[in-house]
Amino acid sequence: MAVSVIILAAGQGTRMHSTLPKVLHQLAGRPLLSHVIATARQLNPAQIIVVYGHGGETVPEAFRAADITWVRQELQLGTGHAALQTLPYIKPDTMLLILSGDVPLVKIETLKRLLAMVDQGGVGLLTVELANPNGYGRIIRDRVGGVSKIIEEADASPEQRRIREVNTGITAIEARYLKQIAPKLSNNNAQGEYYLTDIIEHAVASGEKVVAVSAADSIEVMGVNDRQQLAYLERFYQKREAARLMGEGVSLSDPDRFDLRGELLVGKDVYIDINVILEGRVILGDGVKIGPHCYLRNAVLGEGVEVLANCVIEEAAIDACARVGPFTRIRPETRLGEGVHIGNFVEIKKSTINKNSKVNHLSYIGDATIGKKVNIGAGTITCNYDGANKHHTLIEDNVFIGSDTQLIAPVKIGAGATIGAGATITHDVPPGELTLSRTPQKSWPGWKRPSKK
């Protein structure tokens, strides 16, 4: 039977104490809802429907995904009410898999196991046993162990509250049965809400097959209700990813001080030091070494690249055996060629620096193309902005630029040219020539420093 996924994401999240909708709070650099959608897509469903409410259009606007149907729940009247809002949109003859937008770590294998149990029809629910079940709806079973109903904690008796098997909120139900049961749902309970869990009791009463599948690990069905729970899941996720990477041959100096906030593809013998943050899509070739306190976002590093401490690399590509840092910032649209050295307190923006060139100290290179075997002295600035527009600097192969040089773009430095220290270059420099632009040095014999009176 084809699957339609419904994700309930309309909750207010009052315990987050935030103006941001709860499902947009981030886990590992992505909204909670993004994790759930990504898992749902692995099922290749006939459709994905997201029910949103609190926060209004900020939720769908954060995704703009063509494969998602967005349904707004104007009034938050419970999970049952939220599910019923999808009735005009769901495809007939499908199995509905109802997920929670604030349960980000549920495993695809668990969902497939649940769906397999109801493939021929009926109602399925995912349960879990908790040492401390406070706050969860309890699973009530009959004398032969079958599920008879789910009772929310607010409506449970003291005896029922001692039950440790709880409802996770993840439910599988045929579309035709949800439509059939919809008129029977009631808000006659302590919360005055329409509970999705009431479906179970109605299903049992009408003779529908009801099955329960137990999650192997409580962490995968843990929801986020406050910032402490979010932080707990964040640490769990990061430790899990760290263990996976070490299993693939990555050396982590301290797995507890590593943050992956996206996708990481790695070669062999990669070393990552403490407090490194990787965001977006990062590719690290064989033998890459990342020093402590570095931030990489959407970066590609070739074989043998070394990044020293305290570097920021964003939207950039670095070829084999290059070295960057410490305290270097590589900004978007930058490419560093093989064997390039970028040193301390250097900023590179929207530039290409070719093989074996060096910018070792205290420089800004922006909107520039630099050839091979170029040496850029300390304090060199490409002056690329005239107050209105950005301009390009071209430095050809084998150029030597002395310290404290300003290159006023647009400008071209010919191959093999040498520029003396302290120059301000406003015109193109011919190939192979020495260019100076300083005022002559003068000394005043007999001059004395003023003394204090």
UniProtKB/Swiss-Prot annotation:
Q: Name one GO biological process term.
A: lipid A biosynthetic process
Q: Where is this region: Pyrophosphorylase?
A: 1-227
- Stretches the record annotates as Disordered: 430-453
**Stored Gene3D superfamilies:** Hexapeptide repeat proteins, Spore Coat Polysaccharide Biosynthesis Protein SpsA, Chain A
**Can you say where in the cell this protein is located?**
Cytoplasm
Cofactor(s), by name: Mg(2+)
The question of whether Zinc is a record keyword is answered with no
- List positions binding Mg(2+): D102, N225
Domain of life according to the entry: Bacteria
Q: Where is this region: N-acetyltransferase?
A: 249-453
Q: In which pathway does it act?
A: Nucleotide-sugar biosynthesis; UDP-N-acetyl-alpha-D-glucosamine biosynthesis; N-acetyl-alpha-D-glucosamine 1-phosphate from alpha-D-glucosamine 6-phosphate (route II): step 2/2; Nucleotide-sugar biosynthesis; UDP-N-acetyl-alpha-D-glucosamine biosynthesis; UDP-N-acetyl-alpha-D-glucosamine from N-acetyl-alpha-D-glucosamine 1-phosphate: step 1/1; Bacterial outer membrane biogenesis; LPS lipid A biosynthesis
Q: Keyword Metal-binding on this protein?
A: yes
What this protein is called in its record is: Bifunctional protein GlmU
